[in-house]
């Protein structure tokens, strides 16, 4: 049996070109490097934009790394056992985000050892997937927001997503009306409240905004409010989208069974990696829900190319100037390209996501085990 020989990690922050808020000017990355007993190597990562990256790093270093040594290195085989081992620290959140660092690296190693990509290992079903323009823009002036939307139109996106949740509903109405006028009637418009409303405010807001032909309302309520989302779904006609802040397969099952979400958006890192993501894909199909992976297009886009065909077109979110490639964070060329509104995959092995170190003290990428390939034979 091929087993895990070692897991090493590195914590770093990647500066954002467009800050998401005054206090969100960078995102936390924990780069991971796994070596298997047969010498094969894989690279992965965990990710937490604002809060908790050092905690994720500590869990990887002090608990996951030693507990993974000697376990099966076949992707998916050690995930459940490690999750049960870590469960005392919580079933989801920091634990699943940290588990993704190992899970992604194991999938990367599996594909690299076969000289191919992860999408090929999983079974690519399409050559391209449609993207949509997205941004953290509630703090933008109306003029800045419309300029951003125009950039998305010029980039060929057939759908865009903007933030809502201003203190005054009238301002949300003005902003959404202006964006719809700029988009015209044929492009899709999604809105995201980022958990800013309670049930009654969400009901009133969606009723008022629905005149603008919305594709979905995202995270209208506190993310873990199952009963609230189920009730809101009964009150409104606009599909509810959520999932970026659900951390386990079990929680996705709860929301789907309750009819609390018509669109699910698992973040592949937050749910624990590719292994649990694949189960969430199955759950969404069982319940007839659309599934669009959340953020991280270099990763989400590759997985989107492998998703089974359903009644819903798969979409990939492209937050303006926030992809790892656009931020200059990758040691290698980006594994995906987004152009004319579509995401396609570039030739690469594994996931093709290795992070360039923040160089200090004269170090070079060749000195770093997380970016330099080694011969372990």
In which residue ranges do the predicted regions lie?
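Metal-dependent enolase-superfamily TIM-barrel catalytic cores that perform enediolate-based chemistry
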Residues: 120-236
């Amino acid at each position: 049996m091929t087993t895990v020989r070692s897991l090493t990690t590195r914590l770093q922050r990647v500066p954002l070109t467009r800050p998401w808020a005054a206090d969100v000017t960078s995102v936390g990355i924990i780069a991971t490097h796994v070596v298997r007993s047969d010498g094969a190597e894989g690279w992965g990562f965990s990710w937490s934009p604002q809060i908790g990256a050092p905690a994720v790093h500590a869990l990887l270093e002090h608990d996951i790394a030693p507990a993974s040594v000697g376990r099966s290195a076949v992707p998916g085989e050690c995930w459940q056992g490690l999750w049960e081992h870590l469960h005392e620290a919580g079933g989801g959140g920091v634990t699943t985000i940290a588990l993704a660092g190992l899970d992604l690296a194991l999938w990367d190693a599996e594909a690299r050892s076969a000289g191919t990509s992860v999408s090929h290992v999983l079974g690519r079903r399409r050559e391209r997937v449609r993207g949509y323009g997205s941004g953290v823009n509630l703090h933008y002036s109306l003029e800045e927001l419309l300029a951003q939307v125009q950039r998305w139109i010029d980039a060929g996106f057939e759908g865009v997503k903007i933030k809502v949740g201003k203190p005054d509903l009238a301002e949300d109405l003005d902003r959404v009306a202006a964006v719809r006028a700029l988009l015209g009637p044929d492009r899709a418009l999604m809105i995201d409240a980022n958990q800013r409303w309670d049930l009654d405010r969400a009901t009133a807001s969606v009723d008022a905004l629905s005149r603008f032909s919305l594709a979905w309302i995202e995270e209208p309520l506190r993310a873990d409010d199952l009963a609230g989302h189920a009730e809101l779904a009964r009150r409104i006609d606009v599909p509810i989208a959520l999932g970026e802040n659900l951390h386990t397969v079990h929680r996705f099952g709860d929301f789907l069974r309750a009819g609390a979400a018509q669109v699910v958006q698992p973040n592949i890192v937050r749910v624990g990696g590719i292994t649990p993501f694949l189960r969430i894909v199955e759950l969404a199909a069982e319940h007839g829900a659309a599934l669009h992976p959340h953020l991280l297009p270099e990763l989400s886009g590759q997985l989107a190319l492998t998703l089974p065909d359903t009644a819903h077109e798969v979409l990939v979110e492209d937050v303006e100037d926030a992809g790892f490639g656009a931020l200059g964070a990758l040691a290698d060329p980006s594994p995906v390209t987004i152009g004319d509104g579509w995401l396609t995959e570039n030739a690469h092995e594994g996931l093709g996501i290795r992070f360039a170190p923040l160089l200090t003290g004269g170090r070079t990428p060749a000195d770093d085990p997380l970016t330099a390939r080694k011969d372990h034979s």
